[in-house]
Amino acid sequence: MGGHRMVLLGGAGSPGCKRFVHLGFFVVAVSSLLSASAVTNAPGEMKKELRLAGGENNCSGRVELKIHDKWGTVCSNGWSMNEVSVVCQQLGCPTSIKALGWANSSAGSGYIWMDKVSCTGNESALWDCKHDGWGKHNCTHEKDAGVTCSDGSNLEMRLVNSAGHRCLGRVEIKFQGKWGTVCDDNFSKDHASVICKQLGCGSAISFSGSAKLGAGSGPIWLDDLACNGNESALWDCKHRGWGKHNCDHAEDVGVICLEGADLSLRLVDGVSRCSGRLEVRFQGEWGTVCDDNWDLRDASVVCKQLGCPTAISAIGRVNASEGSGQIWLDNISCEGHEATLWECKHQEWGKHYCHHREDAGVTCSDGADLELRLVGGGSRCAGIVEVEIQKLTGKMCSRGWTLADADVVCRQLGCGSALQTQAKIYSKTGATNTWLFPGSCNGNETTFWQCKNWQWGGLSCDNFEEAKVTCSGHREPRLVGGEIPCSGRVEVKHGDVWGSVCDFDLSLEAASVVCRELQCGTVVSILGGAHFGEGSGQIWGEEFQCSGDESHLSLCSVAPPLDRTCTHSRDVSVVCSRYIDIRLAGGESSCEGRVELKTLGAWGPLCSSHWDMEDAHVLCQQLKCGVAQSIPEGAHFGKGAGQVWSHMFHCTGTEEHIGDCLMTALGAPTCSEGQVASVICSGNQSQTLLPCSSLSPVQTTSSTIPKESEVPCIASGQLRLVGGGGRCAGRVEVYHEGSWGTVCDDNWDMTDANVVCKQLDCGVAINATGSAYFGEGAGAIWLDEVICTGKESHIWQCHSHGWGRHNCRHKEDAGVICSEFMSLRLTNEAHKENCTGRLEVFYNGTWGSIGSSNMSPTTVGVVCRQLGCADNGTVKPIPSDKTPSRPMWVDRVQCPKGVDTLWQCPSSPWKQRQASPSSQESWIICDNKIRLQEGHTDCSGRVEIWHKGSWGTVCDDSWDLNDAKVVCKQLGCGQAVKALKEAAFGPGTGPIWLNEIKCRGNESSLWDCPAKPWSHSDCGHKEDASIQCLPKMTSESHHGTGHPTLTALLVCGAILLVLLIVFLLWTLKRRQIQRLTVSSRGEVLIHQVQYQEMDSKADDLDLLKSSGVIQRHTEKENDNL
């Protein structure tokens, strides 16, 4: 159907259904072919053809065009080789030889279609070039343009030399039966690359002009070549024309290709085969390499080429021995990814400005003899930087030591990021003369050895200063066991060991630092007595002495343990405000000002585009400033500095903290100039919002909290969507007189749904559902016969029967799907893993991918947790064998720590775009997946966990029903029935990943529960833990079922009938359009509208299928049948 999508709805997977569907597509395809035979070009399109007439063959002659079934010629005014090149390429005769004018081309007849044609040479067709207009000219047929092209079959190329090697020598081309040369004017490495590739001789090593590889004789065929290096033949490059030149044979060009170069590499005068002076063999003669611009990237290519993969140092004139003979290469500049040294940029072979005292060398390693560690700092993640290279130990010199260098060291050791760098004065007693000198790290390297220009050896470190670093992993905190992010038992990791903290060792200041480091806002409360459950294992006895201003717990000093006993019953817990820091700035008091957020470590003003009185009131309450009195527009308290954050809060006004409000930041539009959120609070700490009088369904109000009010209040009217998987899709529920109730679907339509979406700040409605599409509600049915005009700001402002007046049951509950409804998935062609694949988001009715730019491990962790896959994962480039996705929706997603969903993470604005090398799609692999094996159902079996690339089991020590509850919930099963021990479903294989698990039952995943460290177990597989859960809850459990095969066939048959009717109507309408004249613009618009309507219907069907509710929809239809 002309490339337009047709989406089949129906969950039936029966063979009968599939046969119906296949038959349907066959019928549609045959009908389409029959219809196409009767269809001409669409209005506004001109059928155009090109040919050469009157020539010796199909690739020479007079240029003729066919327009509106009329053949005509082209005038030769301004006719050049650019135009000829386009004509030849278009006709599949890629080599242009001559541009013929009236003197060489026979005269045509009829129309003269084009004049003053001007091509760049890159057009795909002649009619894409500029010209005076169709049929406009001032020529006669005596000036008809012509061309002579070649299909390349009569052209040959060779390299000529005395040794007879086909891959080096003077370049010669055979044209019109005669061999001739190529002039060296403007000749470059790109030209040489085309020649070597064309001859199958590998890459181009060098080229030379001035007939250095011998002068030829006969014609000089080509001059002033312009190649980009991608051409398949030299004559495909632009040039002056065959035989046109201003050279003689003293300028003949020659080329040496890889297969003719006789190249080799070696290291000499070193302590091993992987170190020494670098020598290169070229054309049978060994020579050296000059050390001009010689650095570690160049050395890394040499080491890799010689099979010694790690470059330790690039040796220059100080340490390398002197060679003799030729100096072959100078000014080498490698990127580091090249496979051979001669692929790097360099001066011409043998051209240099050096002496042998500047010969370059390298020291390489196979990696096994390199070690870097931190010593003397209290853990493996803090201390003096010590290195061991090829069994020689030394220290890192602090001369030139930067935070970027320290960052790389911390990352290499698995210790997070660098918090602090120091230099320790080294005692001369036992001084070492072996030092590692920092080079220039950019901070993105994975190991220190990848940094540029670091040096190793017996150089002097002035003042004996040793480099010292404290990494964030020195004392890394986490919160465990809380019901929401940013709350839980405080656990601290020293090196590789996690332990809890006693409640008398953590002050309010230290708790503030913990919340700040975890990007969880500010501390709300400190709870003792193992409030979130007792930990296991280590209890740290040190007291954290923080000032409260530190960014990381590792920067706080600690007091030695006191002589007092602590057990896990006194484990301390912390509740943070759950969200980023928030403050008021620029006001005359602490209770008014510009709203500023601290996100991703940076303060910036909040955009006011979605800031309202409900949000402002919650902030005032949080800051103990009473209630919100007003939210001034514009930059009332100044624009502020830093990035303007576009977070959108969705507070109801009843929350205690701004972090308790629903919030979205993903895809938020860029904030307009001067749109800065502000608030003026009452300042009365004891003042709270009082309930307003009840609203009638027809009463109008612009907000549940008026913007200006002497006595601020909060109305009872609230709205939510339930059961749709997000805040912008689901069953419509209204809060009235202290309870939530539903809305009846009588007369429910898109206008009503639009009011709901607008009220919830969810965009526009894309579907208005009825018949309890999102499941039946409970309690009151508050509204019925809702009739909106579309201008209302609240659903209860629309006309209705009145509060609680209805003649419905809950099976008629109304629902809505809004354009801001979002869903997340990982998709791959195999469909075997829902925790591995391309990351896609559903937005505005369409699935699209998410870019991987700036995607951090924190962001990947949010994705994996949101999908119920794992706590962490990895992001990789899309595998090359994967099919392209739909357009990309959003890129540059950056999640701070502590967020629940990807929707809360800042990113680029929503915009459909295509993936590119600088903005690639995300392929995510989530870690720590969990499954049940050998059970009788999907919800029973042996518990197995995916960790570090393999599946393993769980030991049954301390295994109980609370542990089973967590696993059942994590797998989406029903209630836990049994926690089974002693390999009840048979022994597993592989590692035993977890032991001594002690869940409370309310954790979101098994790895949130206290347990021994990973793989620390004294169990065998005969002790593998298992569980039994109730089956997964599906809508089938709430409805009767009919005969599945018959139902499926009826559904598929109905769908097929609808498809055929739509297609026949479309075909008839298209034929009507074809009968109209080409100039009828009105009919063109009708044609376009039909296409848009079909696309819109296809998109609607895609939406239902993709939004996660299609299964319920189909089941309900099957039940009704």
From Swiss-Prot:
Cell location: Cell membrane
Stated induction or repression of this protein's expression: Induced by anti-inflammatory mediators such as glucocorticoids and IL10; suppressed by IL4.
Free-text tissue specificity from the UniProt record: Expressed in monocytes and mature macrophages such as Kupffer cells in the liver, red pulp macrophages in the spleen and mesenteric lymph nodes.
Modifications the protein undergoes after translation, according to the UniProt entry: A soluble form (sCD163) is produced by proteolytic shedding which can be induced by lipopolysaccharide, phorbol ester and Fc region of immunoglobulin gamma. This cleavage is dependent on protein kinase C and tyrosine kinases and can be blocked by protease inhibitors. The shedding is inhibited by the tissue inhibitor of metalloproteinase TIMP3, and thus probably induced by membrane-bound metalloproteinases ADAMs.
Domain SRCR stretches: 50-150, 157-258, 265-365, 372-472, 477-577, 582-682, 719-819, 824-927, 930-1030
Disulphide bonds in the chain: 75-139, 88-149, 119-129, 183-247, 196-257, 227-237, 290-354, 303-364, 334-344, 397-461, 410-471, 441-451, 502-566, 515-576, 546-556, 607-671, 620-681, 651-661, 744-808, 757-818, 788-798, 864-926, 895-905, 955-1019, 968-1029, 999-1009
Glycan-linked positions: 104, 138
Signal peptide bounds: 1-38
Regions that span the bilayer: 1046-1066
Entry's Gene Ontology cellular component terms: external side of plasma membrane; extracellular region
Sorted UniProt keywords: Acute phase, Cell membrane, Disulfide bond, Glycoprotein, Inflammatory response, Membrane, Repeat, Secreted, Signal, Transmembrane, Transmembrane helix
GO BP annotations listed: acute-phase response
PROSITE patterns, per database record: SRCR_1, SRCR_2
Written domain comment of the UniProt record: The SRCR domain 3 mediates calcium-sensitive interaction with hemoglobin/haptoglobin complexes.
Name recorded for this polypeptide: Scavenger receptor cysteine-rich type 1 protein M130
Provenance organism: Mus musculus (Mouse)
